[in-house]
């Protein structure tokens, strides 16, 4: 077992164990975990919108990437339900095989973050969170024709609009730093792993919108511009 696979397995086991512990814990303990701090601050504290700059940069200047925006509700500066919507794309040709892979599709993620700092109402926040993601996309593969030396005709390879989809989870740690007024900057490190997936009949797809390179698990990062509203 490689070090990367060992780390991925350990993280996945930890996440599942925590979920099982929360599920099996007495109702009083569960309520205590999800309870808000008691003070004079109102429960609803507004919401914010965010834009991921890493994925946008990759999409603009590379052969794959995504444009992603998020909406985050603020409940008492402690709990933050999140919806993230995006559009991922890839257009890449292998230098050796000359096989070209192309896809583009929208995706969504829903989840929740918790502010882990003791001072919940400060300007900066440290989040731990979970996401569930889904996308339905179509994959296209093509390769230039090759001349068959025996029959002396050209043989090509072409797959168009093969239907695919994927469900996945993300566990994340994120930092939110206030700059000035409603403007924040945010960084997140994410561990992603597949739940269910359907590849095309031709085999494993190379890139999945919103998930990235199609492995059973992977690490990822975001850099966000955040505006409080």
Regions of interest found by a model, annotated:
Residues 31-45, 78, 117-125, 179-185:
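Short loop/turn motifs that connect adjacent beta-strands in outer-membrane beta-barrel proteins
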Residues 54-57, 94-101, 155-161, 208-213:
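Extracellular loop and loop/strand-boundary signature of outer-membrane beta-barrel proteins
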């Amino acid at each position: 077992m490689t070090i990367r696979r060992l780390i991925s397995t350990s993280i996945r086991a930890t996440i599942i164990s925590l979920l099982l512990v929360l599920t099996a814990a007495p109702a009083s303990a569960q309520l205590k975990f999800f309870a808000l701090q008691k003070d004079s601050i109102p429960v609803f504290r507004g919401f914010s919108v965010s834009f991921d700059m890493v994925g946008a940069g990759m999409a603009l200047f590379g052969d794959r990437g995504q444009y992603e925006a998020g909406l985050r509700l603020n409940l008492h500066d402690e709990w933050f339900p999140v919806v993230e919507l995006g559009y991922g794309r890839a257009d890449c040709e292998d230098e050796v095989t000359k096989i070209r892979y192309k896809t583009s599709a929208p995706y969504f993620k829903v989840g929740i973050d918790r502010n882990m700092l003791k001072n919940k109402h400060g300007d900066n926040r440290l989040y731990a969170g979970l996401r569930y993601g889904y996308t339905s996309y179509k994959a296209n593969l093509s390769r230039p024709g090759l001349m068959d030396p025996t029959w002396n005709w050209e043989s090509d390879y072409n797959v168009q609009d093969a239907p695919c989809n994927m469900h996945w989870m993300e566990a994340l740690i994120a930092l939110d730093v206030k700059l000035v007024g409603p403007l924040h900057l945010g960084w997140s490190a994410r561990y992603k792993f597949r739940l269910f997936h359907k590849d095309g009949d031709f085999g494993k797809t190379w890139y999945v919108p919103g998930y990235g390179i199609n492995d059973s698990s992977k690490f990822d990062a975001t850099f966000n511009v955040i505006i409080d509203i």
